[in-house]
Amino acid sequence: MSKSTSTGTSTRTTRLLDLAIGAAAVRAADPGGLRFTERQLYYETCRVLSPAAPLLRRVPGTPPPALRLPSFTRALNARGRETVPGLLPSAPPQATPADLARSRPSEPDLYDYGLPRLLLCQDRSIAAMLLANHVHLEAACPVLAAPDALPLAPLLLAALERADGATVHVLHDASPEGVQLPARVRAALGPVPGVRVGSLGLVPRHAAALRLPSGRGPAPGPAAGADWPAALRPREAAWLARGRFAQVAAVPPARLVRTVLRLTRGPRPPRDSMWGELNGLRTAGFMTWPTA
């Protein structure tokens, strides 16, 4: 291939990716101008580049992404992040538990009341996205990034205990590390009476039902499975044991917001949401998926 031909092909590819990113940004922000993360934009771009995806949405599976992440990053850098409406900046670290313990909130009596629910996110950027879209206000549920919030500050623990029946919701990837997070949260809470830890997902069967793109990382060690939830099915455990993963960021932003609101606020009339047909949460905190 001549140098001029190679240059022309590269230019066309760059132009195609630029158009795909623009279309993906419009879709990610719909409805109502949602804010979204760079990784969410990446997965939305993959959907734009997969025109057959809508035809296969009822066929369970975890296909590979249509676009390599480095190619997307180069295209986004060439376009300029500032040209993408709705794209959030990289999420800064939240206040650490020590910071929370040292400082009182602007409302002096905030922690004097019971806190019936709290949402912990494995991914800092997902926590920032939910906050940017005011999920914490609509659900009356604080949203924190687990890496920064654990162990929880004593003030938060006291507020959860005071609520008498509080739930700490955990939103995590379908990954070897993600499925262990609810157990880590339970251990970090310690013996707090009346506080329940519930997983909102993802687990591999959610990822397959939603046809989320999946990746592959290093396979976990042989002992890793001992810490995985008993509710995992054998084929899910085998999927994770191969180092496979699907990220919460792969869920379309609007669907993610609807689902988190629905599950953190409690029962609501049926809506078109990511887990609209679920019967509820298992006692252990795992979501059940309708049998195909």
Where are these regions (language model features)?
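Nucleic-acid enzyme cleavage-core boundary/entry regions
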Residues: 1-166, 176-292
